[in-house]
Design a protein with these regions (language model features):
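Flexible glycine-/small-residue-rich
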Residues: 48, 57-59, 113-115, 147-149
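Flexible ATP-lid and adjacent glycine-rich G1/G2 motifs of the Bergerat
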Residues: 60-128
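ATP-lid-like helix-loop hinge signature
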Residues: 27-62, 130
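Bergerat-fold GHKL ATPase/HATPase_c domain
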Residues: 1-34, 38-42, 65-72, 158, ...
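N-terminal assembly/transducer modules of large multi-domain enzymes
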Residues: 2-5, 37-41, 49, 130-183
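Short hinge/gating elements
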Residues: 11-20, 80-92, 141-158
Length: 183
């Protein structure tokens, strides 16, 4: 675990220019927080229950899919052709229920953004979107992002997520980022 955190820290110090696909959770979380700040957020809350990261902010509500589009485009070049095809397919499936097409493509990684109390956008990469996950969307006020780290369950650890939070807080000193665990 310490080596994993060290690798994340080293990659982060390089401005995220060179980073492995397994480190996507840190990149995506950084991007989400950056987008929250651009929308005027001054307080960001991150919680972790052992498997899922939840991010709340006090920014203005999302009005379109810009945040998801930027995240997709930013990281598409780092993925294999198969994963790029998956993302392009998912681009077309975001607002098209039922979610069977998404479920068929996914196994391990997901990023869900809510807009108010309705499902807003989904990015999945080897992850499964279940009714339980969708049920989490829209809880509380403001915007919420649910992200499941793309790591094995045995490697899911609050210490690692806490390290990520410290790095991200250093990157964004102008906002208050709080971290709590529900493990």
């Amino acid at each position: 675990m310490k080596n994993y955190v060290k690798r994340i820290r080293e990659s982060y110090r390089k401005e995220l220019n060179v980073i492995e696909v397994n480190d996507l959770p840190l990149i995506l979380l950084t991007e989400v927080i950056n987008q929250s700040i651009l929308r005027g957020a001054t307080k960001i809350k991150v919680s972790f229950d052992g498997a899922i990261l939840m991010v709340h902010d006090n920014a203005a509500p999302l009005e379109d899919d810009d945040i998801m589009w930027r995240v997709t485009c930013r990281h598409e070049g780092m993925m294999s052709p198969e994963r790029r095809r998956m993302f392009r397919i998912l681009d077309r499936q975001w607002s098209s229920p039922p979610y069977a097409a998404v479920n068929a493509l996914c196994k391990k990684f997901k990023l869900i953004v809510s807009k108010g109390n309705r499902l807003h956008s989904i990015i999945c990469n080897d992850g499964i979107v279940t009714s339980d996950n969708i049920g989490e969307v829209g809880i509380g006020d403001g915007n919420m992002v649910i992200m499941e780290p793309m790591i094995e369950a045995s490697g899911t650890d609050t210490t690692m997520i806490g390290e990520m939070m410290e790095l991200i807080q250093e990157r964004f000193p102008q906002v208050t980022i709080t971290f709590r665990t529900r493990v």
